[in-house]
Swiss-Prot record:
UniProt cross-references to Pfam families, sorted A to Z: Adenine_deam_C, Amidohydro_1
BP term (GO), one: adenine catabolic process
Protein name (record): Adenine deaminase
GO molecular function, one term: adenine deaminase activity
InterPro entries: Adenine_deam (IPR006679), Adenine_deam_C (IPR026912), Amidohydro-rel (IPR006680), Metal-dep_hydrolase_composite (IPR011059), Metal_Hydrolase (IPR032466)
EC number: 3.5.4.2
Reactions catalysed, as given in the entry: adenine + H2O + H(+) = hypoxanthine + NH4(+)
Domain of life of the native organism: Bacteria
Gene3D superfamilies: Metal-dependent hydrolases (3.20.20.140), Urease, subunit C, domain 1 (2.30.40.10)
Keyword tags: Hydrolase, Manganese
EC class name: hydrolase
Family: Belongs to the metallo-dependent hydrolases superfamily. Adenine deaminase family.
Phylogenetic placement of the source organism: Bacteria, Pseudomonadati, Thermodesulfobacteriota, Desulfovibrionia, Desulfovibrionales
Cofactor(s) it depends on: Mn(2+)
Name of the gene this protein is made from: ade
Amino acid sequence: MKNNTMNTLIGAAQDESPVDLLVRNVRLVNVLSGEIHDAHIAVKDGIVVGFEEYEALHVVEGNGRHCIPGLIDGHIHIESTLLSPARFAAAAAPHGTAAVMCDPHEIANVMGAEGIEYMLHASAGLPLSVYVMMPSCVPATHMETAGATLRAEDVQDFLSRYPDRMPGLAEMMNYPGVLFRDDEVMAKLEAAASHVIDGHAPLLRGKALNAYVLGGPASDHETSDADEAREKLRKGMHLMIREGGSQEHNLEELVTVLNEFNTQNVSFVSDDKVVNDLMESGHMDDILRKAMAAGIPPVRAVQMASINTARYFRLHRRGAVAPGYRADFVLLDDLQTMRISECYLGGRNVKEIDFTGHSAAFSANTVHVAGLNTDSLHVAAGNGNLRVIGIVPGQVITHALELPPTLREGAAVADPSRDLAKLAVFERHKGTGNVGLGFTAGLGLHKGALAGTVSHDSHNLIVAGMDDADMITAAEEVQCIGGGLAVACDGRVLASLPLPIAGLMSDAPVEDVLAGLRGVNEALATLGYKLSSPFAALAFLSLAVIPSLKLTDKGLVDVHKFEIVPLWTA
């Protein structure tokens, strides 16, 4: 804070000049003292100056409403919303979100450093603060083809050039690389050693967890089991409770732990939140609603969505409502149900903020696919059973199934009667012609196909379907629109959604993106698709760092073995 600003604030706190805003008579959820008390909120130059009565240029009557700090999401991939940073901010701010810790490894896997620069530029100066964590694993594994590679020197470069925007290193997904002390992984950890280093350690326990923590990662958002959560908290990790889109729900399983332990090292995160979930259910407000309904006391719940996150990421004077803190706060008509009345960012009412002036141009075509034809989908009959990816509803983990094939004319084919769909991942960054083939159970498709360039983490072109020709039709539509989502059946495209920003996001108005996504979801519903957020489920079937079985453009990945395995068991 500059001296002239400090002088102004000190003077305003002593009634030397009117404050800009006074919100009178609120019940403040004080995340610093851990209580709820009466207060006025006085704001000058976007900063809280006191809880007392002040002369003000603008007065808002709180009328006893609860006031909570602006909420902070400790781990989100903005790209997963399908919205550009500015469009996302406009959609999230009315839900009480004041800041997010964004990991742009989705666009980084497509465009490398250029993609990170785009996210930094597109989010600069937004009223909703977007902090950008430096992606640690691009590509996520050696078993897939990404559009770029980021090395330790890139980590050093970005963290040194953007000290105020980039708190540290994003989720270190390559935990085997930490345990085996891979040279490049260790170099990245060393480059970020003085910064925050986020972890990513699903099911990691015991001595392996000890070794991982000693390497530098200090948090984890992949915990889905209560005993696992207890161990990670006892070993000093910052536990991020993930409650995001349709495939990421960990809160219910971990509530008992939150009521047993001191929660100062616990935060809530959304991770991946698709635009329809964001607009229909909310953002961090939705997580708080669920947390309090599950029995977590309101003050503790709010702390886990504000001050705990701010302290972990070393955000100065953020995450609370108190003198000297940025004036991000939310007025609630009802605390328990998180019924929001008004939101303020830097002392400005969100309803009066224009987010549209922050859009950044993007023109690159990032979809380059070779070999899109039905011949590329042929799976010749083999020996033994098929290794099949079994979808777990509501989770990003999958089961590794071994099932007998359905054969036709010497080839393994999809079988709607068994809920067995064919799955393909086409490399789309360099036109190599790579295609990985497999099968998945649990989509619920009766016919047709769906395709998209949103496929974690390398974001190649992923296609699932019951008919090879429909799979190619859907894939060709995605290529034609420059990336996005498409549904096809009986040789024609039923619906599609263009995502021209790296095949991941759109800068179209939120309402247009939402309408497009609803269109593809409705088209899928006519084909029998049964999962609540269709493309979110498909997008994670290629995520080769989450157990158990996944598919990349290089083939079927056994995540536990961390190697590519044959499609056939014998």
